[in-house]
C-alpha cells in the first residue's frame, strides 16, 4: 500500500516523532511511505529508512498556506496514496480542498486527534475523515461529545513508541556518572520526571503542586 502522512512540520515533538516512527515501520513492512510537511529536524530520518518527503509550506496558518491545496493535490496525483493520514487541523483543511479536485476514487482518509482541540469549528476538519484515531479514552470521549461523528468511526489507539530508544531499563553507569557530574545537587535524591513539553495541558501545574508538597531534602 501507499500511505501518506500530512502534518505542519517535522520539528522535535510527539506528533512528529510518531509520524517518523510509523513511516519507518510501514517501510519495514514493505509499504510505500511519504510525508508532506514544511520540513524540520526529523526530515532526514525519513530518507534514512526509505520514505519520501514532500516539502510544502503549511506550517503557518494563513491565506498563502491554504492556497497550497493545489500543490498538495499535485503531490497526491504523483504519489497516488491509498491512505492519507492527517495529523493536524490546518493541514486537514488543506487536504479537504485538495481532495475536491481528484477523481471519484479518492484515497481513504484517516485523522488522529492528538489532544483536546479547542475551537470546535476550526477543529472540525479533523472529523472529515473515513476513520478517526483517538489516542486516549479521554480524547475519544471528547470527540464523541464535541463532534457529530459516527461512534463506530472513532477508534481508540494508544500512542506507541520505539522501545529501543525510549526504554524503561535503568540508565548505564556512564550515563549516571555524567548526570551527577553535571547536576551534583541531585546526588542522594529521588528524581521525579515529567516527560514532555512544558505546557499546562500536559499536567505541569499538577506536577509543580506535587513537588511543593514533597520533602525537599529527599527529592
Region roles according to the model:
Residues 6-7, 112, 135, 194-198:
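Short hydrophobic "strand-cap" motifs at the C-terminus of beta-strands
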Residues 5-66, 153:
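N-terminal strand-loop element at the rim of the active site
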Residues 130-168:
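A short, active-site helix/loop in glycosyltransferases that binds the activated sugar's phosphate group
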Residues 8-12, 118, 162-165, 197-201, ...:
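Nucleotide-sugar-dependent glycosyltransferase donor-binding/catalytic pocket residues
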Residues 13-21, 190, 194-213:
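A conserved mid-protein helix/loop that constitutes part of the nucleotide-sugar donor-binding site
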Residues 76, 103-137, 141:
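A conserved, positively charged/aromatic
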Residues 167-185:
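A short helix/loop element that forms part of the nucleotide-sugar donor recognition site in Leloir-type
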Amino acid at each position: 500500500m501507499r500511505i501518506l502522512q500530512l502534518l505542519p512540520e517535522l520539528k522535535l515533538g510527539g506528533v512528529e516523532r510518531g509520524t517518523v516512527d510509523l513511516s519507518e515501520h510501514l517501510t519495514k513492512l514493505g509499504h510505500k511511505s511519504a510525508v508532506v510537511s514544511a520540513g524540520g529536524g526529523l526530515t532526514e530520518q525519513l530518507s534514512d529508512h526509505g520514505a519520501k518527503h514532500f516539502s510544502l509550506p503549511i506550517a503557518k496558518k494563513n491565506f498563502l498556506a491554504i492556497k497550497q491545496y493545489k500543490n498538495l493535490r499535485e503531490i497526491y496525483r504523483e504519489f497516488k496514496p491509498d491512505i492519507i493520514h492527517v495529523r493536524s487541523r490546518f493541514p486537514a483543511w488543506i487536504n479537504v480542498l485538495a481532495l475536491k479536485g481528484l477523481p471519484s476514487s479518492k484515497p481513504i482518509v484517516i485523522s488522529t486527534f492528538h489532544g483536546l482541540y479547542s475551537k470546535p469549528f476550526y477543529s472540525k476538519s479533523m472529523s472529515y475523515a473515513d476513520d478517526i484515531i483517538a489516542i486516549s479514552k479521554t480524547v475519544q470521549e471528547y470527540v464523541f461529545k464535541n463532534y457529530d461523528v459516527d461512534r463506530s468511526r472513532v477508534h481508540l489507539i494508544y500512542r506507541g513508541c520505539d522501545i529501543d530508544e525510549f526504554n524503561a531499563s535503568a540508565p548505564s553507569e556512564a550515563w549516571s556518572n555524567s548526570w551527577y557530574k553535571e547536576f551534583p545537587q541531585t546526588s542522594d535524591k529521588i528524581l521525579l520526571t515529567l516527560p514532555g513539553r512544558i505546557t499546562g495541558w500536559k499536567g505541569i501545574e499538577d506536577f509543580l503542586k506535587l513537588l511543593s508538597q514533597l520533602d525537599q531534602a529527599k527529592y
